[in-house]
Design a protein with these regions (language model features):
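Helix N-cap motif at beta-to-alpha junctions
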Residues: 168-171, 196-204, 233-237, 258-260
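FAD-binding subdomain of flavoenzyme oxidoreductases
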Residues: 83-183, 191-192
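Terminal amphipathic helices with adjacent charged low-complexity linkers/tails
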Residues: 195-208, 212-217
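Short beta-strand
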Residues: 16, 76, 183-189, 244-248
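Conserved glycine-rich FAD pyrophosphate-binding loop
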Residues: 25-29, 189, 209-292
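N-terminal glycine-rich flavin-associated loop
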Residues: 1-16, 36-79, 91-124, 160-167
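N-terminal accessory segments
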Residues: 1-23, 261-266, 290
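Short acidic-glycine loop/turn motifs at beta-strand connectors
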Residues: 29-30, 47-48, 113-117, 188-190, ...
C-alpha cells in the first residue's frame, strides 16, 4: 500500500486538494470532507519513447519545464494547478489540435479507490494494453471515481516553428477548413487567431492559404482565456455575447461566467449513477462534486 493510499484510507468523506485553480468546477465539496494532498514529482521520463511518469501533485509548471528541456510538450493545459487536477478536470490545452486530446494522452493512471486500494489501469504503451478504457473514465471525472496518485502521459516534440497570426475579417469556420492542420483556431467574436506549427515551409504554405480569406498579421500568442470552460455546438456561437473565446473545431469556449448545467436525459442519469455506485458505493470521494 502506498503512503497516499494510507492517507486516503477507507472510510469517511475525502477530497484531494491541488492548486485550487479549478476548485469552482463541478460543485462545492462537502465541508466535512477531509482534505489530502497527492504526492508530487516527475518519476521517470524517456524522451525517446515520448512518455513521462508523473505524480498527481506535481505542478503543470514543473512538468512543462522538464519536457521543454528535452524539446517536448504534452496535452495538459498550462493554466496553473497540478497534473492530477488537470487530468480529473479533463480540460484540453487550447492548442489541442496540435498537441492532441487529453483522453488519448493519458496512457496509464494509478488511483486510490473508495475502499482505499491502489488501482492501476492502462500502460506505458498503447499496444497490448488491457484496461486502456479506465484512464478515459478517470479523465474528467472530477475525482468522483478515484483519487489519482500517478499518471503516464504521452509527450510529443515541440515543432521547429510556431507562429500565431490574427485576422479581423476572416470567418473562423472558413479558416478552420482552409488550413490543413492548424494547432489552434480561436475566435473572440471580432478577431480570429490561428496557431500554425511545423517546419518553416509548412508554416509558410499554411499562411499563404489564409491570405485569400482575410488580412493577417503576426501576434505574440493566444487570446487571454476567461476562467470558465463551456461546451457548445457551432450554431450556438451566432448568438454569443459578452466576453468569450471559442476554440473552433473543438466545441469548447471560455467565458467569464460558468455554464449552466444542462438537463440530462434519464438514460444519462441512470448510466452515471450506476457508474458512480460501482466505483464509489458509499459516496466518500469528493462528495458534492459531479462531472455532469
Amino acid at each position: 500500500m502506498s503512503d497516499f493510499a494510507k492517507l486516503v484510507g477507507a472510510e469517511g468523506p475525502v477530497t484531494v486538494v491541488g492548486g485550487r485553480t479549478r476548485w469552482h468546477v463541478g460543485g462545492k465539496v462537502h465541508p466535512d470532507a477531509r482534505e489530502v494532498h497527492a504526492p508530487s514529482g516527475v518519476m521517470s521520463y524517456d524522451p525517446a519513447e515520448m512518455t513521462v511518469t508523473v505524480r498527481a501533485g506535481t505542478t503543470t509548471t514543473e512538468l512543462t519545464a522538464a519536457l521543454t528541456e528535452a524539446g517536448q510538450r504534452c496535452a495538459l493545459p498550462e493554466r496553473g494547478g497540478t497534473v492530477g487536477g488537470s487530468v480529473v478536470i479533463g480540460e484540453n490545452h487550447p492548442e489541442v489540435l496540435g498537441r492532441g486530446w487529453l483522453t488519448s494522452s493519458v496512457l496509464q493512471v494509478t488511483y486510490i479507490s473508495s475502499e482505499g486500494r491502489l488501482i492501476r489501469g492502462g500502460g506505458p504503451t498503447v499496444k497490448n494494453v488491457s484496461g486502456f478504457d479506465l484512464p478515459r473514465l478517470i479523465v474528467g471525472s472530477l475525482g468522483t471515481l478515484g483519487l489519482v496518485e500517478e499518471v503516464i502521459l504521452r509527450t510529443n516534440p515541440i515543432p521547429p516553428r510556431s507562429q500565431w497570426v490574427e485576422s479581423h475579417d476572416a470567418d473562423p469556420f472558413t479558416v478552420a477548413s482552409r488550413v490543413l492542420r492548424p494547432s489552434a483556431v480561436l475566435w473572440n467574436g471580432s478577431s480570429t487567431r490561428v496557431l500554425l506549427e511545423g517546419h518553416t515551409p509548412d508554416v509558410a504554405a499554411s499562411l499563404n492559404s489564409l491570405t485569400s480569406i482575410g488580412a493577417w498579421s503576426e501576434v505574440d500568442g493566444s487570446f487571454d482565456l476567461p476562467q470558465h470552460r463551456w461546451s457548445f455546438q457551432p450554431a450556438e456561437l451566432n448568438g454569443c455575447s459578452g466576453t468569450f473565446v471559442a476554440s473552433i473545431g473543438v466545441g469548447t469556449a471560455w467565458r467569464d461566467e460558468p455554464q449552466p448545467r444542462p438537463a440530462l436525459s434519464p438514460s444519462v442519469i441512470e448510466i452515471s449513477t450506476r457508474m458512480k455506485n460501482n466505483f464509489d458505493p458509499t459516496g466518500r470521494l469528493n462528495p458534492g462534486r459531479s462531472a455532469f
